[in-house]
Amino acid sequence: MSAAGSNAVGTAIAFRGSHAAVHRSLISKAADGVQISASGVMVAENLIETRAASPGDHNDAIQLLGSPKHITIARNKILNRNPQTSCLYLAGEHIEVRSNYVSGGGWTIYGGASNNGKGGAGASDVAVVDTIFGRDFFEKSGNFGPVTYWNKANVWRDNRFSDGVTIAP
């Protein structure tokens, strides 16, 4: 159920138990595509897209919540047509984001520094590598830009806009 109380899906897939994967799936028509609060999770080769926001929704295509560990997000197409929230909301430890196509959200990626502005240690041992930032919905990939709350101690390498322009965090 969405925040607006309609019959719309709030979260398509929620990982609460460890050592699971979603692979080669279409995940759509939900406010949040995938929520991960478990460890040892892989999300690979999927199309993940949020639906248009209903009043009260807080749409994220992929959310890492709490302190998940050993998460891999690879070779997905991740879309959030909404001008708020994100495609990827990162938290936890040992997070690998590689070879994805991401586009949309307020900020396309919330990088996890300072727990995305909520205080505390935030995400650590994060690598975002070889990811393409599309401009499907907004000129800067996200409505406000491609990335925010990035911890410079983490790895950011070979990330670019779809036209090849390099993105620095």
Residue ranges of model-derived segments:
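Extracellular beta-strand/beta-solenoid scaffold signature
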Residues: 5-14, 28-35, 55-65, 81-92, ...
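Right-handed parallel beta-helix
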Residues: 1-5, 16-32, 39-53, 69-81, ...
